[in-house]
Amino acid sequence: MNRLLQRRLFLENLLVGVNSTFHQMQKHSINTCCRSLQRILDHLILLQTIHSPAFRLDRMQLRQMRTLACLWIHRRNHDLQATLDAINWISP
């Protein structure tokens, strides 16, 4: 499986169970240290999906994926290396 397909599957798999997770979250449950990470992930995911119809997802899905990715990293005890690895892996 090539890297492009792996990234696509990764982004799609972030949507699994997204509705219950997304709607259970409190609006202010993500603290300030993760807000900039959300913006970074949103930008990287958009870069990954914007040029190819095969990768295009609607805005709500992108916001949900961004939030879930942020929460996933947040749950890894704010491990800087895990954060950098995730960002590098999602990056085009």
UniProtKB/Swiss-Prot annotation:
InterPro entries: Rotavirus_NSP6. GO terms for cellular component: host cell mitochondrion. Its main location: host cell. It is found in: Host cytoplasm; Host mitochondrion. Coiled coil: none annotated. Keywords: Host cytoplasm, Host mitochondrion. It holds the Pfam family Rota_NS6. Belongs to the rotavirus A NSP6 family. Interacts with NSP2 and NSP5. This is Non-structural protein 6.
